[in-house]
């Protein structure tokens, strides 16, 4: 019979010290915590945790070894009006587990009870936590440490990026191992990508609603165990764990000079609303982990049924420890925080919130690239530009302005210029650098770039919600024909705008983020909310990729890295050498000219050498170039023996870059 000694309240989680396992679990309101140990046949042994230090329950299992399966049962009041939902009939996952065995199905035994506790035992249905102790030889791995001014982010899904790549062995496609394959790394290097941002790779589950429809949470934002690598993206090769496979991939990417940023989800948990499954925090200490209303209901500021209370001291430390685990154990270079406003809620948003203070005080984490999605759906949830120094932010105002300028004719050039200059009004006056603006035309959430030019309406019927899900405010333009089938004239206009938007993104000041597949002409058939589509709709079709567009994109990124005004990460000032704003006659734009309605022609001179010519109108125009000798530069022309230009004739919806001869 296994016996627990008192052990220690630290380190947190389940820790193997070479002689046994120390177990800890936080619960401020529990009356008893029971450690449940499972053998290979699923037989359960229950042992009361023998000690409590403050709010940490702990015990030590002499002789315990890695591979031990475990979970917890936590007893206490079931009093929803006070926020307590303890139910010892429910086996619970350790919030700090670093591995899980099994899957979470749509099983009624997970129900914890709404007004009364549900007495059905859930142990047989719940995945078991695994104690792991994996040493790893990083072979001198060092972070690429790409300066923000040179950073080009590529947002991708592990499976979507690699599942159909013909040069990756079939058994590795869709896995972490595929990220390490030379064919994939060559693509990233050829493009000029410096930083790969991965959609969640933490252990996530599929919502019961999706399971009933035969769908899955493809994006992975329904995270159950944020310390654990999701085994769904592992190849399953013998002797290679999911954690090792992810480490191998990150090491290979680092060897190629590519950073890795993980998309992390700390705004809500997979337990959803009161009708959702009781799997972890709800049963451990509901009142500490979640934002609750005065009557004990979940404050659903995320739209996902619950919101994690990150201002609670222990929950703050849980997040910090999790981030440090990924940084230390997997050498990740940064994090993108989903619905990041929740990070700063106290409950109102506060730049000095406990989690922000803890991040700033942690030397290791504050040196990482930290990116926030600066909104949630709660009161005061939109916080673009308001995150503390050290964060960069997804800039949806940039996205909408550039779409509106090129596709709708709704945005004047003054607004275009302000966002082209890293949305300076949002960030400069608040002591932030241009790199704080994460510029994007598209992201995983919404239309792809090609679909933005082919669909005026979303087409999300496959999601099973009768096309109600997904945004209706897309600022798209199908140029007169809904869908991918259109005549040559329409496709000519679409392709011109496709290149114009890519050029704008990659030559704007700030940090560009390219959605994987946009450089290939990937379409999701008009689905702008493909979160549940784990199929060819979201997987990149490498066989039909637009090779010319890929070359165009790579040339743009190379061009970007040559222009000091874009790479030095300093604000442009009036009269300096970084930028001059010119009209179609090559003259400096006057204050009055900036205010002239929706004028959509201008020239932008960068670093006194590179001239960006913009015609966002629906007709051809002629521009007179500023003084000097100008010639084309790839991808807009060939510099060898090029014709020297004094004027530029631009077709509708076009952008061009010229270089000044020395």
Swiss-Prot record:
Active site: 338, 373
Keywords: Carbohydrate metabolism, Glycogen metabolism, Glycosidase, Hydrolase
Glycoprotein recorded as keyword: no
Swiss-Prot/TrEMBL site (Transition state stabilizer) positions: 445
GO BP: any one term: glycogen catabolic process
KW Calcium (keyword) present: no
Record Pfam families: CBM_48 (PF02922), GlgX_C (PF18390)
Enzyme Commission number(s) of this protein: 3.2.1.196
Classification via InterPro entries: GlgX_C, GlgX_Isoamylase_N_E_set, Glyco_hydro_13_cat_dom, Glyco_hydro_13_N, Glyco_hydro_b, Glycogen_debranch_bac, Glycogen_debranch_GlgX, Glycoside_hydrolase_SF
CDD domains noted in UniProt: AmyAc_Glg_debranch, E_set_GDE_Isoamylase_N
Catalysis: reaction(s): Hydrolysis of (1->6)-alpha-D-glucosidic linkages to branches with degrees of polymerization of three or four glucose residues in limit dextrin
This protein's pathway: Glycan degradation; glycogen degradation
Molecular function per GO: glycogen debranching enzyme activity; hydrolase activity, hydrolyzing O-glycosyl compounds
Function: Removes maltotriose and maltotetraose chains that are attached by 1,6-alpha-linkage to the limit dextrin main chain, generating a debranched limit dextrin.
Family recorded in the similarity comment: Belongs to the glycosyl hydrolase 13 family.
Name used for this protein in its record: Glycogen debranching enzyme
Classification of source organism: Bacteria, Pseudomonadati, Pseudomonadota, Gammaproteobacteria, Enterobacterales
Gene from which the chain derives: glgX
